Amino acid sequence: SLVTFCLTSCGLTSSLYYWGGVQNGATTYENLAYKNYDKQTPESLCKLICMYEDIVSNPGGTRRMPPPGICAEYGYMLLIPENATIFAEHATAMQKRTFDSGDYATFFPEKGKELLQKEIELYPESAKFITPLIERLCK
């Protein structure tokens, strides 16, 4: 009937991807990314790294995979040597428990390269952009 159709078509739709964090609260991927890129602080960087890890490690949404570009963004961020130093010096104990390694200078670049490769695996169309990035950054 028309009523049934209207009720089912007006229901909540599921998101294709999980973007991490609290949706109606303050901490969302969008807010953290904006704050970090607008005025990066050690705290904003540490929070964003942990948000990326949550999104990549716990893919949700109807597709059950990280959103397009997230692995590439996160991987690139981990390949910046200063970010490993900042994380080691400023991350909270809880944030540091996100990763098994305490040697961030070695762990971050390895994981960064893996994430760039994962972006290509999940989204083959990204290879044209990501492959030269890997070649340039992961010598």
Put a short name on every predicted segment:
Residues 6-9:
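C-terminal motif of bacterial Sec signal peptides marking the signal peptidase cleavage site
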Residues 112-113, 124:
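Secondary-structure-rich domain cores
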